[in-house]
């Protein structure tokens, strides 16, 4: 056993989520959830000798060779510069579990569980779980500006949890002090996407709005009506597409956050085609075919399916799935007669093919 004789503790989200589930009367199996471990009294070389693989070079975090779970040496951190990465890390074998837990962001994330199942909770995290409170562990919280976005994301991830008043003061001070501009777009995007997948994504924006945290990275999302996002399935791509933004705002937001092109495409498709497709049985056949071609739906239905999932009406989604999608296969089979195709070249061929497919589609729509 690779962890034999190591002093290890389960920490972070697995412990937090189990305690939350227990309070809600839900069953949870910590062994099957995402788990992180802290190792006390060991060195990096000891873990390497056991076959663990170190992740990166800045932090003493290692992957278990079999489970691929993360094992981190107990460590302390000291601020030495601005931004998310400006820390000196001390992971010597003398760092205690209590010291390690003291560097964490929120009390609910600063609970450890020993091999005997006992909880080590020096900062009252279990009480804050009972009170549904997001509270910082110490004043060192302000040393990492990414924590502003993490707190907002936890508000979205954990329904009913509210930010403690004293933590709200720190968040506002960090935002007003322009600490957020030191973050990388990649880290902000990661928190943004996690929030979009959370049960209450609108809470992410509400918390950031309340602490002046939208202006540097998400100004387009200020004062938007976003509570409807939670009505749709927890897919970040779909929920990004549903943000009530115009094309210019989508482009600006995506460029600032270095968002993947698929997210921009989904938002643009929503603006261009969702209304038309929501009324597809009554749409002019030419307009419908042009939309389907623009979506490349005759070759790949991925973009069309995403638009279908954005629709509020289950009946409409079912009708697209049951009637329009199968119709695409038939539409692809509509081609020009060989003798006519042989006489056409260039744009003329495309126009003629469009004509026969519009005629076919018009007949199919009339028969619905």
Name the predicted role of every residue range.
Residues 1-368:
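Catalytic cores of the polymerase beta-like nucleotidyltransferase superfamily
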């Amino acid at each position: 056993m690779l962890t034999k004789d190591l002093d290890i503790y389960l920490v972070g989200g697995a412990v937090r989520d189990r305690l939350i589930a227990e309070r809600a009367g839900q069953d949870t199996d910590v062994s099957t959830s995402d788990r992180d471990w802290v190792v006390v009294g060991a060195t990096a070389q000891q873990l390497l000798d056991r076959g663990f693989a170190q992740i990166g070079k800045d932090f003493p975090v290692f992957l278990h060779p079999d489970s691929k779970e993360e094992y981190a040496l107990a460590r302390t951190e000291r601020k030495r510069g601005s931004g998310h990465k400006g820390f000196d890390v001390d992971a010597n074998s003398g760092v205690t579990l209590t010291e390690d837990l003291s560097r964490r962001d929120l009390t609910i994330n600063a609970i450890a569980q020993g091999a005997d199942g006992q909880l080590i909770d020096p900062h009252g995290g279990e009480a804050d779980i009972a009170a549904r409170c997001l509270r910082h562990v110490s004043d060192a919280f302000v040393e990492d500006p990414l924590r502003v976005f993490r707190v907002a994301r936890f508000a979205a991830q954990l329904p009913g949890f509210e930010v403690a008043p004293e933590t709200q003061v720190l968040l506002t001070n960090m935002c007003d002090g322009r600490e957020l501009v030191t973050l990388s777009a990649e880290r902000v995007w990661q928190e943004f996407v996690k929030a979009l997948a959370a049960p209450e994504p609108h809470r992410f924006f509400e918390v950031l709005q309340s602490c002046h945290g939208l202006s540097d990275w998400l100004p387009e999302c200020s004062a938007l009506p976003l509570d409807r996002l939670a009505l749709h399935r927890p897919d970040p791509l779909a929920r990004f597409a549903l943000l009530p933004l115009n094309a210019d705002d989508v482009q600006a937001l995506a460029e600032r956050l270095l968002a993947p092109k698929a997210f921009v495409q989904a938002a643009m498709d929503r603006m261009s085609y969702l209304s038309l497709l929501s009324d597809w049985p009554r749409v002019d056949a030419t307009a419908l075919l042009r939309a389907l071609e623009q979506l490349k739906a005759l070759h790949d239905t991925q973009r069309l399916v995403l638009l279908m999932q954005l629709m509020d009406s289950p009946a409409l989604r079912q009708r697209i799935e049951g009637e329009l999608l199968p119709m695409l296969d038939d539409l692809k089979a509509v081609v020009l007669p060989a003798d006519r195709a042989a006489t056409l070249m260039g744009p003329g061929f495309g126009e003629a093919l469009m004509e026969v497919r519009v005629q076919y589609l018009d007949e199919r729509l009339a028969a619905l």
